[in-house]
Structure formats: C-alpha cells, structure tokens
UniProtKB/Swiss-Prot annotation:
Region of interest: Disordered: 1-24
InterPro entries referenced in this protein's UniProt entry, alphabetically: Ribosomal_uL16, Ribosomal_uL16_bact-type, Ribosomal_uL16_CS, Ribosomal_uL16_dom, Ribosomal_uL16_sf
Gene: rplP
Biased composition regions of type Basic residues, renumbered to the chain: 1-16
Keyword list, A-Z: Ribonucleoprotein, Ribosomal protein, RNA-binding, rRNA-binding, tRNA-binding
GO cellular component labels: cytosolic large ribosomal subunit
This protein's name: Large ribosomal subunit protein uL16
Native source species: Arthrobacter sp. (strain FB24)
Database matches in PANTHER family: 50S/60S RIBOSOMAL PROTEIN L16, LARGE RIBOSOMAL SUBUNIT PROTEIN UL16M
GO BP, one annotated term: translation
Record keyword rRNA-binding present: yes
Length: 138
C-alpha cells in the first residue's frame, strides 16, 4: 500500500479538482498507458487494486510503472457525531488526479495483452480513462 512515511502536517485542505493536468500527460517510461479523462481522488487502495489486476494479467512478462502517489490525507468525522469540535481524523490517502494525467504505464508485452491488462485496471479506478500508446520513437 502506498502511504507517505512521514508528513509535515497530519491534516490538509482538500485539493481542488478543476482544470487539466499540466505535467505527466505523455507516456514517458513504457509503451502503453492509462490516461485520465475526468478528475478524481484516487485512493491508495484503488491504486494497489489496479496494479494487482494488471500484474496478474500480464503474468511474468512486462513491466508496470505507477505515475501517481497518494500524498494527500482525506479526513472523515465518525458516524453520528455532531458538527463542530474540529476536523475529523485522517481516513484515506489520495492522489488528486486531473484530466490528461497518465496514471499507469506498461511495456514488454504484446498489444492484445497490454490492452486487456489496462482495461482491467481502468475498471478498478473511480474515473473515466482511456488507453494511450507512446508517441514516436518506436
């Protein structure tokens, strides 16, 4: 599970989800990638679930890169608690994903295997996404 080892502040403001991604919009390490088409908070559990789905499908071949990291805490107040008395306790670690961001990359497998593995991973994520191929330099 991806969790920061230590953080300067235990609780943060919620990051804004509007606007498009400014960096990390191209496939840079692998041959294939998953590109976000909608904004979302992706939790560390969702990232791990997508990674497992991909690696199980490609079996021993290929290499997977994870380009996002859950570095923001999201807080939650306990059920049936009155409002007030401070901010809730950190519940999840999330990555703020904006449209255009490449989340995962994959290489070392055939096109059919890569497309199916990435399709399985997309189903584990809480956003709309598409499969993209590396541009040029093949």
């Amino acid at each position: 599970m991806l969790i920061p080892r230590r953080v300067k502040h235990r609780k943060q403001h919620h990051p804004g989800r509007s606007g498009a991604a400014t960096g990390g919009t191209k496939v840079s390490f692998g041959e294939w990638g998953i590109q976000a088409l909608s904004p979302a908070y992706v939790t560390n559990r969702q990232i791990e679930s997508a990674r497992i789905a991909m690696t199980r499908h490609i079996k021993r071949g290929g290499k997977v890169w994870i380009n996002i990291y859950p570095d923001r805490p999201l807080t939650k107040k306990p059920a049936e608690t009155r409002m007030g008395s401070g901010k809730g306790s950190p519940e999840w670690w999330v990555s703020n994903v904006k449209p255009g961001r490449v989340l995962f990359e994959l290489s070392g497998v055939s096109e059919e295997v890569a497309r199916e593995a990435l399709r399985l991973a997309i189903h584990k994520l809480p956003l709309k996404a598409r499969i993209v191929r590396r541009e040029g330099g093949e």
